[in-house]
Swiss-Prot record:
Entry annotated with the keyword rRNA-binding: no
KW Metal-binding (keyword) present: no
Residues with PTM N6-biotinyllysine: 35
Entry's EC annotation: 4.1.1.-
UniProt cross-references to CDD domains, sorted A to Z: biotinyl_domain
Domain Biotinyl-binding: 1-69
Localization of this protein: Cytoplasm
The protein, known as: Biotin carrier protein MADF
Keywords, comma-separated and alphabetical: Biotin, Cytoplasm, Decarboxylase, Lyase
Predominant location category: cytoplasm
Amino acid sequence: MEIKSKMPGSIIEVKVSVGDNLEAGSLILIMEALKMKQEIRSQEGGVVKELKVNTGDRVSPGQVLAIIE
């Protein structure tokens, strides 16, 4: 499952690492968009296969942030 950005913004903090086991609703990262902090959470459980962003990165709408399997 790909976790994607819904709007442009900046990554404030990444809360997971590759290999972490997640439950549905687990916090993956925090981003700032439109001067507001937004929590990005997993829609379903799984294992973090890949992180596509780091703290401080700028992201665009539709950009893949992480891959969960």
